[in-house]
Amino acid sequence: MSRLSHSEVHMVHRIGWLRAAVLGANDGLVSTASLVVGVAAAGSARPEILIAGLAGLVAGAMSMAAGEYVSVSSQTDAEQADIARETRELRETPEAELDELTRNYVARGLDESLARQVATQLTEKDALGAHSRDELGIPETVTAHPIQAALVSAATFAVGAVVPLIIAVLAPAAQITLFVAITTLAALAVLGGLGASAGGAGIFKGAMRVTFWGALAMAATAGVGMLFGVVA
């Protein structure tokens, strides 16, 4: 009975949207909070801080969307080019492709007769799928989706960027830097933990690594803000 009810959920199925979501939200938090902290540390008033933060949100979301779309599109183009070439080779030289698939399975540990049998059966069922998966290394579960990655990155960036802006609105004017920094570090810890948990990694490690880099980014921009604030 346990065999019949057994099912597995693999983390690799989530890798496309998970990568874009975590990267987008993390970047939105860190970049916008760092911008707010830097401008506030320079002695700017609340309206200037909010304008800078809102501009950073819009520009960052668009940049993330464009960057993810271009990056993933390039990956997709490469995959499609390889698949097109494999399709042509399967049509023009099927025996050579069968031999190639057989050698692939022999290299993985099967004896030659069994490898030939496996290659033949998989070719009869779905030749292109077998070659794409076992020769080119392009499994269907991780095929790139440019539009999905772009939309997820832009949306999650905006969600992450909203957090420091809300704090900048609500915090006392003289303590915007402190409130934004503390809230952002807490949000980064939660985000890192959730991302690590969704990906099957350690929660503490995931939380600590994003918190460290977020703190470093805010410290650097605060230093820049204080330097120019003093000069001004």
Language-model regions: role of each:
Residues 1-20, 72-154:
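Cytosol/matrix-facing amphipathic helices and coiled-coil assembly/linker segments
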Residues 28-33, 153-163:
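Core segments of transmembrane alpha-helices
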Residues 13-24, 46-54, 114, 146-151, ...:
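The feature identifies polytopic integral membrane transport proteins across all domains of life
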